[in-house]
Structures are given as C-alpha cells and as structure tokens.
Amino acid sequence: MASDPRLPVVLLWHMHQPQYRDALTGRYVLPWTYLHAMKDYTDMAAHMEANPAARAVVNFTPVLLEQLEEISRRIAEHLRSGTPLPDPVLALLGPEPVPAEPAERLELLRACLKAQRKQMIERFGPYLELATLAETLGTAERVSYASDQLIHDLAVWYHLAWLGETVRRSDTFVSILTQQGRAFTAAQRRELLSLIGNLVASIVPRYRKLSERGQCELSVTPYGHPIIPLLLDFQSARDAVPNMPLPQHPSYPGGAERAQWHVRESMRVFKQAFGKEPGGCWPAEGAISRGTLELLDRAGFKWAATSANVLQGALARTDPKAARDSRAYNRPYRLPGGSMVEFFRDDTLSDLIGFTYATWHGDDAAHNLVNELAHLARQYAEAPSPESAGTGVGGDGPKRHAVLIALDGENAWEHYPFNGYYFLRALYSLLASHPLLELTTLSECVARGIEPLPLQTVMAGSWVHGTLATWMGDPAKNRAWDLLCEAKLAFDGVMASGTLDAARRAAAERQLALCESSDWFWWFGDYNPADAVSQFDSLYRRQLVVLYRLLGLPPPEELAQPISVGRGSPEHGGVMRRAYAT
C-alpha cells in the first residue's frame, strides 16, 4: 500500500428485501423485491458495466437472492405455460381479467400509486393523469367507475416508472410504450412482463460477471437479516441505551446456535449464487457486538463493516482523546487476537448520498462528494506521525486510512431525478480518475495490508444512531420479540420430539429464520407510517402462523391481533434512517 499515495475509497451498496411471500398461498404480499430488481439492482450493475474503471462492494442478503431466483422462475413459467404470477400487481400484466370484486379493484388501484410522487409519477404526464383519476376513484363508493382498461394502463405505467433509467434509455420497446401513453394491449403487457422477467433473471449473472472481471466485490449478510447482537444477548441493547426496556423473556432461546445457522446458511446460498465464498460480511443493519464480531471471525470472513457511530461509542469508553481525534476514523480496526478486519463507514459522507444529494444537480453532488474525499486525503497526508503527535492513532494517511461509504443501495435513488443516473455516472467517473483517490474494495484494502488499529472495546450498536433501539425497547417491538421467543420455544420442543420428517424439519428451520429477520422489528412503533406498519405487522404475524403450522401446532390466538399501529410520517417513508438523530 505504501507504493500508492492515493487514499483508498470504497463504495458499499447494501441490497436487501425481506421475504414477502406468504408461504401458505405462494403469493407475494408486497412487490418491492421485483420492483427494486428492475430499477435499482439493474441500474447499479449498468453503471459499473458502462465504466470499466468503476469499482464497488455490493452486498446481497441470501433471502433476497432466493426471492430473485423464485420470482424470475415463476415469471418464466407463466410466460411458458400460463401458471399464476406471484404478485397481484404483476399479474395485471398477464392475460387474466381484472378481478371483479370491488375491494380487490380498490386495492389494485392503490397499489399502482406506490411510487415516489415527484420523480416517478409527476415525471410522466400520462401516469400523472391516470394517477389523479385513480385517486379520485380510489374509494369504495367510486371504484366501480374504474374500467379494466384504466387499471391495466395504470399497471403498465406503474411498471414503466419502476424501470431502471438505464433500461429506459436503451430499450426501444419501453420508448414505444412511453410515447403511446394509453390503451396498452394485452400483447404489449405481455412483452413488458417478459422484459421484467429478463431483468430480474439477469441480476445475479450480471453481478457475478462484474465480480469475475474484478470490478465488483460481492459480500453477504447472515441469511435472514437478523440482528445478531440481539440473538446472542438481549442485554446488548442496553450497551448504548442503559435504561432500555427489554422483552419479558430474558434472552432469545438458543440464540447463539441460531446466529451460527444464519451465518452458515448465508455462505451456502451465496456460493450457490456466485460460485465462490464471500470474503466479507455486512451484518444486518451494521449491528455488531463483540460476540458478533467473534462469530464472523470464526466463520472465516476477512472483513466486516459497520458504522463510525458504533466506533465512536466504543472509543469514548476507553480513549476519549482518540474518540475526538478525526484520524481515529476512516481506519480499519481488529479485535486483539482476531484475524478479521473491521471497517467503519464514514457516516457523514454516506448520509449525504442517502438524504442530501437527491435535491442537487447530479454533477454538482458528485463533485461535492469527491471534493470532500480529496480534502480528507490531503488532511490525512499532512497529519503528524504517531510519534510526533503523541497519540495512538497517527497520521500518514493513505498508508493507514481507507474511507468507506456504505448505504442502502436501493431505496435512495427514487428520490433522485432519473433514479440517480447523472449522479452515479459522474461519481464513478470522478473517483476513478482522481489523482488523490483510489477507488477500490475492502478485500483489496485487507490484502494490501492497511494496518488495523486494535479494537479494545466494542459497543453493541448499529448504523442507526449507533444503538439497537430501532429493533428493541419500544413496547410493540418487545411484544414482537416475546412472540418470537414463544415460537422458538415451541420450535425447540417439536424438534426435540423427533415427530417431524427431515423435509418438514428443514422447512420449519428456514421459516424460523424468516421470523428472525430484523425487518419486522424495524417497522413496529407509532413513529412509522400507518400503511407500512400495518403491512409488516400482518406479514410478521403471518410468518409466525406459518411456522406453527409447519410444526404441527395451532397458532396462538394472539397472532390474530395487531402488534403495532403507525401514526408517523418519517423521512423517506421510514425505509432509510440517518446515522445520527436530527
């Protein structure tokens, strides 16, 4: 590393969607997996394909990889033999008539409006006209006036708006539909469905190819996206919030074994998809504890990544002077006696992409971010050495520092004009050619020997405010944990009895993993939007019901009752949160 004076810069895009399929019906309750595939996963691959000098780490969750495979397969089967499509909104592109039941028609009308208003609806005149009409007719009293053609046209525009910008600019058929505006035929809907199926099916092969040619490092999250520190120890939630109320159960039963299962299964699914084992891990929500890092180290990961606010909390306990020293950040660390290297993202720069730059001109935003990085490169290079500074963190920047910018790789872009097209194109171009910056990957940083500092203390926390309060502490969140604990105890009892055959045992174990996902707990709490809370609350309880049925047990009656009610209107609809509370 000493031979290259440039400051290493790593972009990490985290791709995740929880399991939206209802295992009892086979239908997807929410469409976000295939929509983000055709828009964001597609565009993010295309930007790297268009610029051979572009580099990034792309993190996939196994539960997302499995959904991509299933959805693409079921679309292909439908086109080949007419089998049902997995999603009710996607099914509007198929040959079946629009449901006649008024309640179903109303639900479909409303579903086709779930797109960012300014950038995805108002951008297209015909879609805005249809959306305005749908809003007028979107009541139980008026929905009967919504014709089948209106609903079909609205569904076509919904999917056109959710297409990646790189597809919109290159696909002739999409241009034809966009110019036509209305009165789409069944044949056109089928062709659009075929395009969507091809886009979803192409995601894994495209990223695998980018990895094989050295542009993209692929990493993984434990299988079901669980908050591993909480699986290991509920008390870890009090590490950053000492007085946090906890669930009634003292701990998650068998949590250590479940955490190990999620890690093992993630490596299996990842290898099946990409043909090799992952070198690095982004723990779900960047949530870590000492036990979490030790578990990932034992699993053989070369690196793990989380947030600087977690590092700041840890340093403040052991070395307050270092916690205030800017040179302590954008540095790799390692537990004493461990092998795995820990990277802590630059929260400020990451949140600029997630929450600020969407309102800027894309080129201006990219230049601003690169200027911030160049300033850091000069600052680190000019900093005094450890000996002259008299601290343990030192300067000698490019040889010791690496800036990680890590964030959700899918939800930010709908707030940008053109799905972030101009920003991302300019960002990759500027970073790849800057004389002070080296666009690279985390495994390359490890391989080149950037010297890690010792991580003497670990504060359990996440990239959201440096705490675990997003997933525990609220009464609804704690109740959800208690319901999960009770289901796990039932699971343990049935497994110990030996009454299930091997296939049923495996199905129950995977279903338990889906119930352990962090996503359900994220949405509980009255500060979240009502619709999202209702949907995720219902789906979580449904996942638990499926688990009980796989175990051959009657589901508890309380699973028929909502856990939480949302009343809030958070930034970005609550799907993303800043590193620091505002």
Regions found by a protein language model. Name each.
Residues N59-L64, P222-H225, G280-I288, S443-V446:
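Short, solvent-exposed turn/loop segments enriched in Gly/Ser/Thr/Pro and often Arg
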Residues G255-P320, N411-H434, E438:
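Catalytic domains of cell-wall/extracellular-matrix polysaccharide-remodeling enzymes
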Residues T139, Y145, L150, L154-K209, ...:
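Extended, H/D-rich, highly charged conserved domains that either
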Residues E49-N51, R206-S219, A381:
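Acidic (Asp/Glu)-rich catalytic clusters
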Residues A389-G392:
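Glycine-biased, low-complexity coil/linker segments
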Residues S3-Q179, P320-P384, G397-T582:
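Active-site and substrate-binding clefts of carbohydrate-active enzymes
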Residues G26-A37, R182-N198, P245-A259, E277-A284, ...:
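The substrate-binding groove and active-site-proximal loops of carbohydrate-active enzymes
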Residues P242, L246-P283, A374-P384, G397-A406:
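CE4/NodB-like, metal-dependent polysaccharide N-deacetylase domain
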